[in-house]
Swiss-Prot record:
Keywords: Glycoprotein, Hydrolase, Lipid degradation, Lipid metabolism, Secreted, Signal. It is found in: Secreted. Its EC number is 3.1.1.-. It comes from Arabidopsis thaliana (Mouse-ear cress). Residues 1-25 form the signal peptide. Glycans are attached at N178. Its main location: secreted. InterPro entries: GDSL, GDSL_esterase/lipase, SGNH_hydro_sf, SGNH_plant_lipase-like. One of its GO terms (biological process) is lipid catabolic process. GO terms for molecular function: hydrolase activity, acting on ester bonds. Belongs to the 'GDSL' lipolytic enzyme family. This is GDSL esterase/lipase At2g19060.
């Protein structure tokens, strides 16, 4: 079983490499990023928030040190940019010039959610709705041609905080009291549909939407909802209907936008979190953080010890993944191993 899975991974990666090599140069003219801390590359540095990581040991393996990325090194958008053969940095919105709207901007913000109230206890954050507003202003001010915008890649990672920092954090939130798992998923998807429509109106035609991962298997939720002994089943059960409905939403958008040659794909982070696959890929620690996290916290303690074998860990802190895990996700997404209906590579070609 493990041998077959390993061979499948190798075959898929090799196929993706061959396809990419058939196309010369940068694969898209611009790349726009939306989402939460998983994608944030420094926007929260400028905000009054607890969700800020512009300090050591964050960035310990990043060339420029701590930048506001919630990892020890490169995050998922960084690796996506590499796969797209983009030679320049995609700047965070808070430090981007108007001219950079022609080549790409990262609007993601730690703590952001589909709901405006999500993560309000942490302080300032740029919600998904506000990120889209920022994008609209930037491309309109810069005068980016509509035909160019249709050729850009758009990636979105949003929804985790609506569970971590809302539904499963009762005070000061009431969503847990008002919605069942299925009802809450419907409520979130209703907002997601509206936001995707907004991006579509603004020219997005190549869109990769990342689902929510197995939040119950993060060190944070294992400690708070799993009794410290294993994945929090209740949390994962809550997330499942959201991912299913989000995947259905992507299918819906592909059906209604086929005339306009728009393509949407779903990146399944939930089903891909398999212990056997982790082991095959060299990860031996899947339930603990690599950095030092103080009791009751989720982010790394400043200037405290970190594990030396970071390539063996899935989690960097109590929620966010290591550079090694981020790289695997992107390779799998470009090879089509965790995407539906098409790989990110086919999305941009």
């Amino acid at each position: 079983m493990a041998d077959k899975m390993f061979k499948a991974l190798l075959w898929a990666f090799a196929t993706a490499v061959v396809m990419a090599e058939a196309v010369r140069g940068q694969l898209v003219p611009c790349y726009f990023v939306f989402g939460d801390s998983v994608f944030d590359n420094g926007n929260n540095n400028e905000l009054d928030t607890l969700a800020k990581v512009n300090y050591s040991p964050y960035g310990i393996d990043f060339a420029r040190g701590p930048t506001g990325r919630f990892s020890n090194g490169r995050n998922i958008p960084d690796f996506i940019a590499e796969e797209l053969r983009i030679s320049y940095d995609i700047p965070p919105f808070t430090r981007a010039s108007t001219e950079q709207a022609h080549t790409g901007i990262n609007y993601a913000s730690g703590g952001a959610g589909l709901l405006e109230e999500t993560s309000q206890h942490l302080g300032e954050r740029i919600s998904f709705e506000k990120q889209i507003t920022n994008h609209r202003k930037m491309i309109m001010t810069a005068g980016v041609p509509p035909e160019k915008l249709k050729k850009c890649l758009y990636t979105i990672n949003i929804g985790s905080n609506d569970y971590l920092n809302n539904y499963f954090m009762p005070a000061p939130y009431t969503t847990n009291e008002n919605f069942s798992f299925d009802e809450y998923a419907d409520f979130l998807i209703q907002s997601y549909r509206s936001y995707l429509k907004s991006l579509y109106v603004l020219g997005a035609r190549k869109v990769a939407v990342f689902g929510v991962s197995k939040l119950g298997c993060t060190p944070r939720m294992i400690a708070s909802h799993g009794g410290g002994k294993g994945c929090a089943t209740e949390v994962n059960k809550a997330v499942e209907p959201f991912n299913k409905k989000l995947k259905d939403l992507i299918s819906e958008f592909n059906r209604i936008s086929v005339v306009d040659h728009a393509k949407f794909t779903f990146v399944d982070l939930f089903s891909s979190q398999n212990p056997i696959e982790y082991f095959i890929l060299g990860f031996t620690v899947t339930d603990k953080s690599c950095c030092t996290v103080e009791s009751g916290q989720e982010l790394c303690a400043a200037n405290k010890p970190v594990c030396p074998n970071r390539e063996r860990y899935v989690y960097w802190d109590n929620v966010h993944s290591t550079e090694a895990a981020n790289k695997v996700v992107v390779k799998a997404a470009f090879a089509g191993l965790i995407t539906s209906p098409i790989s990110i590579l086919l999305l941009v070609l």
